[in-house]
């Protein structure tokens, strides 16, 4: 609480004292102790590297069905890959995270259908890489990249992420070969 006092005089119409409630959120050096909103504020200010280091983790809890697999309160760590990586192309003031540790062990999220060509955690639903990463089943359907974090595709990994994390996600441009099928190193294939 802050109280502002006005000096005596007649050149104002303000009350002699005014009390205001103020809420201050200060980031801590322990990444996991911060809310995703606080992490986003620090990131947007370009100060992430002043508080945290590459490898620091923040626990998230996955809940929901992703394709045919149901996550039920699975705690997984998101960890910092870097700060302002490739900022000239991807934008400044970003903290880059990767999901995939339980404790300190790297894990891959996958279902029992990975060896089938059905609707599981697969790159594509047929034995092809046609369309490259941009049109892949993994990107559009499993990960849910065909919608936005605040309105995720149903039954996608994006929808299984905590809402407070999805609320602060920022778009980042990643350059990938979106044509596939062995087209070679051709500049126009990269988008």
Report the location of each language-model feature.
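Extracellular/surface recognition and adhesion modules
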Residues: 1-4, 20-22, 80
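C-terminal edge beta-strand
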Residues: 16-26
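Enriched for extracellular/lumenal, surface-exposed ectodomains of secreted and cell-surface proteins
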Residues: 4-18
């Amino acid at each position: 609480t802050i109280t502002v006092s006005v000096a005596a005089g007649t050149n104002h119409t303000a009350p002699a004292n005014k009390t205001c409630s103020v809420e201050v959120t200060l980031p801590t050096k322990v990444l996991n102790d911060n809310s995703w909103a606080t992490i986003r504020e620090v990131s947007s200010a370009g100060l992430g590297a002043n508080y945290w280091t590459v490898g620091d983790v923040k626990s998230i809890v996955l809940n929901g069905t992703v394709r045919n697999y149901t996550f039920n309160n699975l705690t997984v760590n998101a960890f910092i890959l870097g700060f302002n990586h490739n900022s000239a192309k991807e934008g400044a003031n970003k903290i880059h995270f990767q999901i995939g540790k339980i404790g300190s062990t790297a894990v891959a999220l996958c279902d029992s259908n990975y060896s089938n060509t059905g609707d599981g955690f697969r790159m594509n639903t047929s034995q092809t890489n046609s369309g490259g990463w941009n049109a892949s089943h993994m990107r559009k359907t499993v990960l849910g990249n065909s919608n936005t974090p605040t309105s995720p595709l149903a039954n996608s990994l994006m929808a299984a992420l905590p809402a407070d994390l999805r609320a602060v996600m920022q778009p980042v441009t990643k350059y990938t070969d979106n044509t596939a099928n062995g087209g070679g190193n051709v500049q126009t294939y990269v988008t």
